[in-house]
């Protein structure tokens, strides 16, 4: 049976900074990891990749049934060359329909044994193991989580032990000897046993762990590889965001979008009976996380409405209900990470943006004044006649951009910006690792308004020392627009396309030590 199918081996090579020139994605109601949008004359086209191909193996690793983010990560880690084993779309669908073992295609028996168990989850001697960090959400039952914490002589960190059979921890996916990386979004790799126990106690009746299993932890220590929290598996979480796709009806989509009061962000309200919104599964009080694949977590009400309208006669929303939102906030993860794990363009094999949760439910009350004071700030600026009224500065050779020379009474001053504030996000996009010029361009391209997440120098140093991700949810929410209580109907007779004005005139100068642009 397998001899009737002919997979192709495609070897792609690119230059540093170049893209492979294709998209790797998954699609609704379509099986497999699909190759899409193969660019003309790109490394992908030259290697023989075609639109609709399904990726079976990456560098010999069988990936057909693995999570999309893991497949993306394998390509990303391949550097400037990667070998893909692919099957054309028609053959793939026939193979699936006739239940052909896709692992056997294009592989000798010897090759099959090399690396099929690299990706997670796999069964190893009856025990499930993983090769990436994973989030586990525990809700206490009968006053117990069903686990204990231990330290191991000669090893740094705290580990899971005494897992109660069929207890809360086991059902949540916790394994014996798991290395505990985070408690409620806070890194605890350098914390003592007593400190970790105290954090878990303070968490109350629910807690979120970021864990890695024993074997994976051992490999990372031996290879001196640091875990990236944004690669964490969300598979074990009991509540997940929902992707809602709608086509506009004669009376619009049939819902109101309202700025939340208790809940930060934009909330779905007053869904019309029988409307496209109701039929697509949208629910009252859903929080909008993304519109047509773009995060809207830090955008204001009018901007989100405009993004929906720009979608024309159809739109795709990533939404969460209150329970799911609270769970993700506890982990300091954005629900947008779920969208990225489902479908991520990978022609450029780009890094996933740093998580930017919409809001944060504090898992334990701060017990010191120091913790209360350490907050980032969300600042919304409206451009004046002379720009935004601040200079953007960066130290050559060092990451990060920061605020200088805030003009008294200017837009930046009125929005709460201060000298030495470090810029974390521009319009919801994390820019900490972006070059100075790109940060400048993002601000200038924002038109007449820009939303910045910034952090004072002392607070920034504190978060860095504690390994706490700086996210918008830690900041106080922006003021709710005065008309938000009335709601805005997203419907067909409002389809204006507001062109964003790009600022062309900026005063700038540079020296041997810094680069400085007036906004």
Curated annotation (Swiss-Prot):
Keywords linked to the UniProt accession: Cell membrane, Membrane, Phosphoprotein, Repeat
An individual GO BP term: positive regulation of protein localization to membrane
Alphabetical list of SUPFAM superfamilies matching this protein: PDZ domain-like (SSF50156)
GO terms of molecular function: PDZ domain binding; protein-containing complex binding; protein-membrane adaptor activity; scavenger receptor binding; signaling receptor binding; transporter activator activity
CDD domains given in the database record: PDZ_NHERF-like
Residues where Phosphoserine is found: 108, 148, 192, 250, 334, 348, 492, 508, 510-512, 514
InterPro entries (alphabetical): NHER (IPR051067), PDZ (IPR001478), PDZ_sf (IPR036034)
Domain of life of the native organism: Eukaryota
Polar residues bias: start-end ranges: 357-367
Chief subcellular location: membrane
Residue ranges annotated for the PDZ domain, each copy included: 9-90, 134-215, 243-323, 378-458
A GO CC term assigned to this protein in UniProt: apical plasma membrane
Region (Disordered): 347-374, 479-519
Tissues in which the protein is found: Expression is limited to epithelial cells. Expressed in the kidney (brush border of proximal tubule), pancreas, liver, and small intestine. Expressed at a lower level in the adrenal cortex, testis and stomach. Overexpressed in breast, renal and lung carcinomas.
Low complexity composition-biased segments: 505-519
Extent of Basic and acidic residues compositional bias: 482-504
Modified residue annotations for Phosphothreonine: 451
Subcellular compartments: Membrane; Cell membrane
Membrane topology per record: Peripheral membrane protein
Family the UniProt entry places it in: Belongs to the NHER family.
Function: A scaffold protein that connects plasma membrane proteins and regulatory components, regulating their surface expression in epithelial cells apical domains. May be involved in the coordination of a diverse range of regulatory processes for ion transport and second messenger cascades. In complex with NHERF1, may cluster proteins that are functionally dependent in a mutual fashion and modulate the trafficking and the activity of the associated membrane proteins. May play a role in the cellular mechanisms associated with multidrug resistance through its interaction with ABCC2 and PDZK1IP1.
Comment text on domains: The PDZ 2 and 3 domains seem to be involved in the interaction with SLC26A3.
Quaternary structure annotation from Swiss-Prot or TrEMBL: Interacts with PDZK1IP1 and ABCC2. Interacts (via PDZ domains 1 and 3) with SCARB1 (C-terminal domain). Forms a heterodimeric complex with NHERF1. Interacts with AKAP2, BCR, CFTR, SLC22A12, SLC22A4, SLC22A5, NHERF2 and SLC17A1. Component of a complex, composed of PDZK1, SYNGAP1, KLHL17 and NMDA receptors. Interacts (via PDZ1 domain) directly with KLHL17; the interaction is important for integrity of actin cytoskeleton structures in neurons. Interacts (via the first PDZ domain) with PTGIR (via non-isoprenylated C-terminus).
Protein known as: Na(+)/H(+) exchange regulatory cofactor NHE-RF3
Organism annotation: Homo sapiens (Human)
């Amino acid at each position: 049976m397998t001899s009737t199918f002919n997979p192709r081996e495609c070897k792609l090579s690119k230059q540093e900074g170049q893209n492979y020139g294709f998209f790797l994605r998954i699609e609704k109601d379509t099986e497999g990891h699909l190759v899409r949008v193969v660019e003309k004359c790109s490394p992908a086209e030259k290697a023989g990749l075609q639109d609709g191909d399904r990726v079976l193996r990456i560098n010999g690793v069988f990936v057909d049934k693995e999570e999309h983010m893991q497949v993306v990560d394998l390509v990303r880690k391949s550097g400037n060359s990667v070998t893909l084993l692919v099957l054309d779309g028609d053959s793939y669908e026939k193979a699936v329909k006739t239940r052909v073992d896709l692992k056997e295609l294009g592989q000798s028996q010897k090759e099959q044994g090399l690396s099929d168990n690299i990706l997670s989850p796999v069964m190893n001697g009856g025990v499930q193991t993983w090769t990436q960090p994973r989030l586990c959400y525990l809700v206490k039952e009968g006053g117990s989580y069903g686990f204990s914490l231990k330290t191991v002589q000669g090893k740094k960190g705290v580990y899971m032990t005494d897992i109660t059979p069929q207890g809360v921890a086991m059902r949540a996916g916790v394994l014996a000897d798991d290395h505990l990386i985070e408690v409620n979004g806070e890194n605890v790799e350098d914390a003592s046993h007593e400190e970790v126990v105290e954090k878990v106690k303070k968490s109350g009746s629910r807690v979120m762990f970021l864990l890695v299993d024993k074997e994976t932890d051992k490999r990372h220590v031996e290879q001196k590889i640091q875990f990236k929290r944004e690669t964490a598996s969300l598979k074990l979480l009991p509540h997940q965001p929902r992707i809602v796709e709608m086509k506009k009806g004669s009376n619009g989509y049939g819902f109101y979008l309202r700025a939340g009061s208790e809940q930060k962000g934009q909330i779905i309200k007053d869904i019309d009976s029988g409307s496209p919104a109701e039929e697509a599964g949208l629910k009252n009080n859903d929080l909008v996380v993304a519109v047509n694949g773009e995060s809207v977590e830090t955008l204001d009400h009018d901007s989100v409405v405009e993004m929906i309208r720009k979608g024309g006669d159809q739109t795709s929303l990533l939404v969460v209900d209150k329970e799911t939102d609270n769970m993700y906030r506890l982990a300091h993860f954005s629900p947008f990470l779920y969208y990225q794990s489902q479908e991520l363009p990978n022609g450029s094999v780009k890094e996933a943006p740093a998580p930017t949760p919409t809001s944060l439910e504090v898992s334990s009350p701060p017990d010191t004044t120091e913790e209360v004071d350490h907050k980032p700030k969300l600042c919304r600026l409206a451009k004046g006649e002379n720009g935004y009224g601040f200079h953007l500065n960066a130290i050559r050779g060092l990451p990060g951009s920061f605020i200088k020379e805030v003009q008294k009474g200017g837009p930046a001053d009125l929005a709460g910006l201060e000298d030495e504030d470090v810029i974390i996000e521009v319009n919801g996009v994390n820019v900490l690792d972006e070059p100075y010029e790109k940060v400048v361009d993002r601000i200038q391209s924002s038109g007449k308004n820009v939303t910045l997440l910034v952090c004072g120098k002392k607070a920034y140093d504190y978060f860095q020392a504690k390994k706490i991700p700086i996210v918008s949810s830690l900041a106080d929410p922006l003021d709710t627009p005065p008309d938000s209580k009335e709601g805005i109907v997203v419907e067909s007779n409002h389809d204006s396309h507001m062109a964003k004005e790009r600022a062309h005139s900026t005063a700038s100068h540079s020296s041997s030590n810094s680069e400085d642009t007036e906004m």
